[in-house]
């Protein structure tokens, strides 16, 4: 795993009126937060996943014969329980500010960022589970003029490829308007990281663009893919961050 060394929006697919969600797809891959009236306040970005049906134990097959519609909604896996699934997905982001400063916000190395001062991005654990699971990122769009671009990514901490065993999704919750959903359901059995979504300031307009690019390496490979130019070294989460 990699730890940092010191040193015009198109049409989109929307869900039902009840779901109040925009789904970014390959065909309709971007939305303007500015045009949605959602370019201020805190943008919350959340990572969630559940195991694919074939990876859930018990009498799953027999149960599906009796209740076929359960296949449409597999049981969710709560938190990061290693005993249940042995999958540890983490959320992070690369940032670049308009003053030229660049960096990463991620659990590795305790690089949690700051929401009220540069980089105006902060990683927070999921409070529902009482631990620093690293599943939520906050972006302070009140400082959008200072933000050039933010690349949100997901990686597998324990290095065991597992994207093909999970239904993972990243959801953006703007301060106003519908949430924005990006599914990571493409099958890439050997991938260890995925660039999910780019948040970019384009001539004063805040654009959210679907990426969903899987790579076999970690943060350094995502850096090279998007030309961030940071220097990377081996990184670890502390016991409290796991």
Short names for language-model regions:
Residues 1-149, 153-242:
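Intrinsic-disorder/low-complexity signal
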